[in-house]
From Swiss-Prot:
Main location: membrane
Keyword Phosphoprotein assigned: yes
Keywords: Membrane, Phosphoprotein, Transmembrane, Transmembrane helix
Membrane spanning stretches: 131-151, 181-201, 220-240, 249-269, 290-310
Native organism: Saccharomyces cerevisiae (strain ATCC 204508 / S288c) (Baker's yeast)
Family: Belongs to the YIP1 family.
Subcellular location: Membrane
Gene expressing this chain: YIP5
Protein name as catalogued: Protein YIP5
GO terms of biological process kind: vesicle-mediated transport
Gene Ontology cellular component list: Golgi apparatus; membrane
Length: 310
């Protein structure tokens, strides 16, 4: 009789609910849950066996992917066995030109001092290709920024600081940005454009033995870039004199300073392009066609610098 009552209560209402799963077995009844080693019950034996097994594996083998952190001076991702150095970077345009910006500070200072002291040390360290474009980019950028900020800075110091007169409304911003644009195209165009012409002239010169053998155009660009170091003090002096440029005496001094910069930079270019062992040519006073073309282009550059910027 009780069984009939239980079957009478088992009514399917065609709705999904808890009563639909009342007669189904519990899937967790047959699951074996291991006990922790510290549990004091009858099932602790099997549980302790499970934990002892996993614990021994964890102690003997480290976690997958676990490694010590890199040292303080270690470059992440660097592999000492890949054989890739300054001349062995992986293919790619950025990697190709990035080697020209890997320069030692001592070597950079040595090249800067060689320009100012008329020494021929720029490319005489060794036969290894130590060409850099770092100097060509940043020395030229320094010259451009001096031409852009020097005049305004001097006016601010003299008028606003010393005399105490505000001259903010009298600034000729059009002439300042005009000088900036002219400095950019003139110096960067000369530094990175003329070496392509010079390279072609050097390759076609009949007296090529008088000239140094350049392996690539970036090597010539590096020479022209370091030659711009001479124009840093020249531009500083010219900007100071430019405040009184109406006087004829000041204009004559500006011409003399530009001529001095031309002479020193021309000498540096000549010393770098000419062969170091060419003592016979230097004693006879003869110059190759390449040197004549280089000096002529440099003279044109100095004239444009004098008339356009100052």
């Amino acid at each position: 009789m009780p069984s009939n009552n239980s079957s009478f209560l088992d009514i399917d209402d065609d709705l999904e609910g808890v009563d639909d799963f009342g007669n189904e077995p519990n899937p967790f009844d047959d699951a074996t849950v291991p006990d922790s080693p510290n549990m004091n019950n009858s099932t602790a034996g099997k549980g302790s066996e499970f934990y002892n097994t996993t614990g021994s594996k964890a102690e003997s083998a480290p976690l997958q992917g676990q490694m010590d952190p890199p040292a303080y001076d270690q470059v992440i991702g660097q592999n000492d066995n890949d054989g890739l150095g300054r001349n062995g970077l992986r293919p790619g345009l950025i990697n190709y030109y990035s080697k020209y910006f890997q320069i030692d500070l001592t070597q950079f200072k040595k090249r800067l001092s060689a320009v100012l002291t008329f020494r021929n040390d720029h490319n005489s360290e060794s036969n290894e290709d130590n060409t850099d474009l770092y100097g060509a980019v940043w020395i030229t950028a320094t010259v451009v920024m001096i031409n852009f900020t020097m005049s305004r800075g001097l006016n601010f110091i003299i008028s606003d600081v010393i005399e105490g007169v505000k001259t903010g409304e009298d600034i000729d911003r059009a002439s300042q940005f005009k000088k900036l644009l002219h400095s950019i195209w003139l110096f960067y165009g000369y530094t990175f454009g003329v070496p392509f012409i010079t390279m072609q002239v050097l390759n076609r010169d009949e007296h090529s033995e008088r000239n140094r053998s350049f392996k690539s155009v970036p090597e010539l660009i590096s020479v022209y870039g370091y030659a711009n170091l001479i124009w840093i003090p020249v531009c500083v002096i010219l900007n100071i004199l430019d405040m009184s440029k109406r006087l004829r005496t000041v204009q004559a001094i500006q011409w003399a300073i530009v001529a001095l910069g031309w002479a020193q930079s021309s000498y540096f270019l000549n010393s770098q392009i000419s062969s170091n062992n060419n003592t016979e040519t230097q004693s006879n006073g003869k110059f190759s066609l390449s040197i004549i073309v280089v000096v002529a282009l440099h003279t044109l550059f100095c004239l444009l610098f004098r008339f356009i910027i100052f």
